[in-house]
Amino acid sequence: DLALTGFDDDELARLTIEQTEGLTDPDDVPEPQAEAVSVLGDVWLLGRHRLVCGDSTTVEAVDACLAGVKPHLMVTDPPYGVNYDPGWRQRVGINNSERMGVVLNDDQADWREAWALFPGEVAYVWHGGMHAAVVAASLEACDFVIRAQIIWAKESLVMGRGHYHWQHEPCWYAVRKSGTGHWSGDRKQTTLWPIATRGEAAADDATVHSTQKPVECMRRPIENNSSPGQAVYEPFSG
């Protein structure tokens, strides 16, 4: 006698409802389209993350991305403005890397339109050393104060066509004039970050991104200037 269980009629009805078969196998994964299609304005929900197909220098795209959230931290790897040609090493026979993806808008280093739409106080902006002054000026124009320049020291040089081969990349650490920095790191931090890329080559080839960074380049700023559960903004999906 189910009445002896102590449940009322409504509760018993919910507990004894007959399970029906769905229209598809819940474990069945559909085949992906031959060509993934995304259009301007699409918002992709990737777990807790939001990815927008749009222009991060426009209010509409930024509003769609943030959806009312106001992150205090931005960690970004925008185009450097160096017109990087990922195919030149193959053409001269230096290597056969699969990392041939072209960085769009790589003729521009000043992204103040994007900085102006960021509602927070703290920014880490990776940039090309040749345009460090341009990037600093773009941040200062948006009421940021440069606090430090971080240097990613690579374990090996990047073969170039100049007299000197680059073995580092810089990142500006900036805080709004009225900001606090929201520092969560310890007192042992320095501006020199020796970060290895060994072991990530296969992953780099899989993404075909020609200038992909190690995850540590983005993880360290997040740990130093935010707390678990807080949102972090990346206007260039770097």
Which positions does each model-derived feature cover?
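Core catalytic lobe of class I
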Residues: 1-238
